[in-house]
Amino acid sequence: DTGYARVPLVCQSCIYDLGFGSASVRPDAAMGYEACEDAKANHPRSGNTGAGCGATVGKLCGMERASKSGLGIYAVRLGRLEMAAVVVVNALGDIFDPESGKKIAGLRSEDGSGFADTREELYKLSKRTDMFTGNTTIGAVITNGKFSKAEMNKIASMTRNAYARCINPVGTLADGDTIYAASVGDVEADINVAGTLAAQVMERAIANAIHAL
């Protein structure tokens, strides 16, 4: 029992979005099938789509001061090496564009006229506080590079640098961040190149989750 509704503990990873909208609205098998058909027929979309429909950020002071977020996708090719990233940005912290450094989503000011600083608000907490824990940024990188399981684990670890560059604060006890990495090809590539590229692609995917709204 989550306080909003009861949820089955059967999935590998999911974002907690029952506090956004109605907790009684649930996807079913027909909706899943329709989503797959739509994904085959159309180009991948970022923003308020798929798992990003219930995503929010900047929730330190509650949902009433949070910002809408979404699903982000980005992909690049470096020579023969291809790298793609997909991420659902559902974080406690604020979101920053990796190129401009500008805050693009996060905790809103009390009067709603702009953004507050989640980090500064966090520093004001003088004692242990029960924060809202329904924050989980879930991402995945997929490459055609040929890597072992251990090497893909390292690439996933390097990809997490994107979270640190785009989300602040990040990795708190109120966040349940996850990154998956998968190889679907046989292109020979250097692991350091792949890991660095994966982080860069994930940065752009995080930004797209906001810019595409």
Whereabouts are the PLM-identified features?
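A structural signal for small-residue-enriched, beta-sheet-centric alpha/beta enzyme cores
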Residues: 1-213
